[in-house]
From Swiss-Prot:
Organism, as annotated: Cryptococcus neoformans var. grubii serotype A (strain H99 / ATCC 208821 / CBS 10515 / FGSC 9487)
Role, per record: Virulence factor which promotes fungal virulence by enhancing type 2 inflammation in the mouse host. Likely binds mouse Tlr4 independently of Ly96/Md2 and activates Tlr4 signaling to drive Stat3 phosphorylation in interstitial macrophages, which promotes the initial induction of Arg1/arginase-1 and increases macrophage sensitivity to Il4 signaling.
Keywords, ordered alphabetically: Glycoprotein, Secreted, Signal, Virulence
Protein's UniProt name: Protein CPL1
Subcellular location as annotated: Secreted
A GO CC term attached to the entry: extracellular region
InterPro entries per the UniProt record, alphabetical: CPL1-like, PriA/CPL1_fungi
Amino acid sequence: MFSIPPSVRRLVFLFLIAAPLLSIVLPVAAAPAGVDPPSKLQPRAPQPSRRMGATKRSKKIEPLKKKDYSSFLCPGGSVACPIPGDEVSPSSVEALEKSLNSLADWFKVGFECVELETELNSCGGCLALGSGQDCALIENARTTGCENGSCQVYSCFDGYVVSPDRTSCVKRGSTIPATPVTAVNVEEFVADDQLPFGQ
């Protein structure tokens, strides 16, 4: 037969004596005014159960974004631009974009590291990917540069003047020319922090 150790018997005896005394000393908290306490415990209201294997709400699947490999291929501030094999056209740009899916693809095609804010031949974007401009190809421009990602014309060939917005050359007399950058007015540019050629 099973016997209870004396220490456990003493604890049970103390509990049986102490429980009624505690209920007298610590009365049950009164219910808030105007609310009747329930006389019996009430069962929960029935609810439908979930079926096992019920379908979950489908999550929105976002299309995968192409990874930018420039940080792996070029030092800070530079962007990797693919080197085009042929003439750049909308179809060649599309084909090139589809073919550049991994680092290995970039090495197969070939690339150069370009600072798009200042690069004369790829100003503001990669020409092979259909963006940017080659500032050296501006018609009738003698000297050009790339400032803040946009081409700037500094001087034009004879018969042409720099346009007021400094992005092209126009026939002399067809418009008011831009103020030329000379040694006389360089001080104005220095005051405005607008020196050409990064001087």
